[in-house]
C-alpha cells in the first residue's frame, strides 16, 4: 500500500491507498518539532484506530513545504522498510508544467494539477484553501501554467485580531448572511465570504484569460468546505485532491520504472 503525505504549513494530510483506491485518510497538525519517533507513534495510533497495519505500507510519497519534516518522514519510511519518493525534480518526467520557473512550483500545486487533469479533465482551475489560498490553472492540454497565491483565511483573521485592538479572534465558520449583524459575524463575513468572493473574481478573470469559460473549477484544502457554502463558483469540492495527485504521480513513476 502507498501512504501519500501532503505536508502543509498548518496541517499534514495523509491518505492510505491500495492501488488507486483511497482506503483511509487523516489530518494532523504540522509541528516542525516532531521527530521520527513522534511521527511513527502517531502513525501507529491512526492505523490502530481503523484496524489497519502499518506493516502493509510498502511506499511513502511526500509533497510538502517543510524540509526538516521531510527528513523525519524519510526516517520513518526506513523504519518500516518502505520506499520513499519526494514530489519534485525527481518526478518531473511524469508531470506537465509550463510555468516560467517549473522548478519553483510547490509540490502540492503540482499534485493538484495532476489530480485535476486525471480525475476531472482539462482545462481546470484548482482553488486550494490552506495556510495560503493557492489558485492553480491547468490549460486544455493538461499543463500547469500558473495561478495565484493569496493569504489564507486563518492568516487573515489572525492578523486582524493581532493588529486591531478591539477585534477579537472569532471561530472560523461560514456566516448565515452576507451582511453581518454584529462584530463577530462581520469578521466572519469579511473573512469567509470575502475569500469566496476573491475566488469568484479571480476564477472569472482566469477563465477569460484562458479563453475557456467551461474550465472545471475544483475547491480543495482544509477550509474548502467552509468556503463552498458561501459561493456557487465551484463545480467540485474534493478535499482529498492533493493526496490523490500524489498517488497518481507515484503510480506514473512506477510505470516509468
Predicted regions located by residue number:
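ATP-binding/phosphotransfer module of carbohydrate and carboxylate kinases, centering on a glycine-rich
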Residues: 2-4, 30, 156-257
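Short glycine-aspartate micro-motif
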Residues: 2-6, 61, 124-128, 218
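Short glycine-rich, Thr/Ser-proximal phosphate-binding strand/loop in the N-terminal lobe
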Residues: 2-48, 142-168, 174-177, 185
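Short beta-strand scaffold segments in enzyme catalytic cores
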Residues: 12-16, 126, 133-138
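Phosphate/pyrophosphate-binding loops at sites that engage ATP/ADP/AMP, CoA/4′-phosphopantetheine
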Residues: 43-58, 202-215
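Short beta-strand-loop/turn "lid" adjacent to the catalytic site in phosphate-handling enzymes
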Residues: 50-105, 141-147, 152-153, 181-192, ...
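Conserved phosphate-binding catalytic cores of ATP/NTP-utilizing and phosphoryl-transfer enzymes
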Residues: 93-124, 247-255
Amino acid at each position: 500500500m502507498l501512504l501519500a503525505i501532503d505536508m502543509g504549513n498548518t496541517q499534514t494530510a495523509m491518505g492510505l491507498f491500495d492501488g488507486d483506491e483511497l482506503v483511509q485518510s487523516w489530518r494532523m497538525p504540522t509541528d516542525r518539532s516532531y521527530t521520527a519517533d513522534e511521527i511513527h507513534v502517531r502513525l501507529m495510533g491512526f492505523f490502530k484506530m481503523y484496524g489497519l497495519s502499518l506493516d502493509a505500507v510498502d511506499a511513502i510519497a511526500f509533497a510538502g513545504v517543510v524540509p526538516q519534516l521531510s527528513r523525519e518522514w524519510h526516517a520513518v519510511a526506513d523504519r518500516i522498510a518502505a520506499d520513499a519518493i519526494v514530489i519534485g525534480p525527481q518526478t518531473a518526467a511524469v508531470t506537465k508544467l509550463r510555468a516560467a520557473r517549473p522548478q519553483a512550483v510547490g509540490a502540492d500545486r503540482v499534485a493538484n494539477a495532476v489530480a485535476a487533469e486525471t480525475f476531472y479533465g482539462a482545462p481546470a482551475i484548482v482553488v486550494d484553501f490552506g495556510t495560503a489560498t493557492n489558485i492553480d490553472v491547468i490549460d486544455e492540454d493538461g499543463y500547469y501554467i500558473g495561478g495565484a497565491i493569496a493569504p489564507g483565511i486563518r492568516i487573515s483573521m489572525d492578523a486582524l485580531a493581532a493588529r486591531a485592538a478591539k477585534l477579537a479572534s472569532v471561530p472560523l465558520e461560514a456566516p448565515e448572511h452576507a451582511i453581518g449583524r454584529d462584530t463577530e459575524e462581520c469578521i466572519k463575513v469579511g473573512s469567509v465570504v470575502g475569500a469566496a468572493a476573491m475566488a469568484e473574481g479571480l476564477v472569472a478573470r482566469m477563465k477569460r484569460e484562458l479563453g475557456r469559460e467551461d474550465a472545471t473549477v475544483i475547491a480543495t484544502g482544509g477550509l474548502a468546505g467552509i468556503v463552498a457554502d458561501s459561493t456557487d463558483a465551484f463545480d467540485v469540492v474534493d478535499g482529498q485532491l492533493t493526496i490523490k495527485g500524489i498517488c497518481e504521480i507515484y503510480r506514473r513513476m512506477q510505470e516509468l520504472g
